[in-house]
């Protein structure tokens, strides 16, 4: 029985494999089959470039930025920043221990949601923040949304590579379902009722100027989460 303890997107390995395939005729065609297997094994065993702390910080940066792009204000950004950071840090630590993807996703999302609630409660008490800022609750779990597998699954299916496409699609739907159920369960247990975002009341020009760096931060954060080398950013 084949069992994969954990999986995910590793763009560092993807880039190396792409270079290997692209330069195979020129640089690797003289290798024996065993040598090629050994080379691929070395690529497969490459450790991640970034620690769990950096992965957590990257998730915090990305989710804090994207919650602003979705319409959230500074309370949502702060709470999402802290929640996503701790959630992805936990998920990364569990991944290093070879704990299954579904378990690490569920625990990571639960911690992210609980941290958002705790952080929001502190802001409520300290700064009398409106309860409507609960709307950013979903931002704390954005780090688990499998956008990469969703997109690549559609590309595979469009090329009639049904096996790869359906496998990736099933993986993406499973992760999304687990994250949604955990987020809903935590909100239900603590009687949390996120509503729509409060309007930011910013001018179109100021909103544009703020969205530009927020977009960069969001993409940069997710790039680090996907183990992309800084040389390729």
Describe the role of every protein-language-model region.
Residues 231-233:
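Conserved small/polar residues in nucleotide/adenosyl-binding loops
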Residues 1-38, 42:
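Soluble N-terminal domains of membrane-associated systems
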């Amino acid at each position: 029985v084949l069992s994969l303890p954990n999986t995910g997107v590793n763009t560092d390995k993807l880039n190396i494999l792409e270079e290997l395939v692209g330069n195979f005729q020129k640089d690797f065609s003289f290798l024996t089959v065993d040598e090629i297997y050994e080379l691929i094994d070395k690529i497969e065993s490459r450790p991640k470039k970034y620690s769990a702390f950096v992965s957590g910080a990257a998730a915090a940066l990305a989710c804090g930025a994207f919650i602003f792009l979705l319409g959230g204000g500074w309370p949502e950004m702060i709470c999402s920043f802290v929640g996503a950071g701790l959630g992805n840090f936990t998920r990364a630590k569990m991944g290093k221990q070879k704990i299954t993807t579904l378990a690490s996703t569920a625990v990571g999302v639960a911690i992210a949601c609980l941290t958002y609630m705790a952080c929001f409660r502190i802001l409520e008490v300290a700064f009398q923040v409106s309860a409507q800022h609960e709307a950013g609750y979903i931002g704390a779990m954005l780090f688990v949304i499998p956008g990469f597998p969703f997109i690549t699954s559609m590309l595979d299916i469009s090329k009639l590579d049904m096996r790869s496409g359906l496998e990736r699609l099933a993986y993406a739907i499973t992760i999304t379902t687990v994250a949604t159920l955990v987020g809903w369960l935590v909100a239900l247990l603590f009687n949390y009722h996120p509503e729509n975002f409060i309007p930011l009341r910013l001018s179109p020009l100021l909103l544009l100027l703020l969205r530009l760096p927020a977009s960069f931060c969001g993409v940069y954060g997710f790039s680090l989460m996907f183990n992309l080398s800084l040389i390729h950013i």
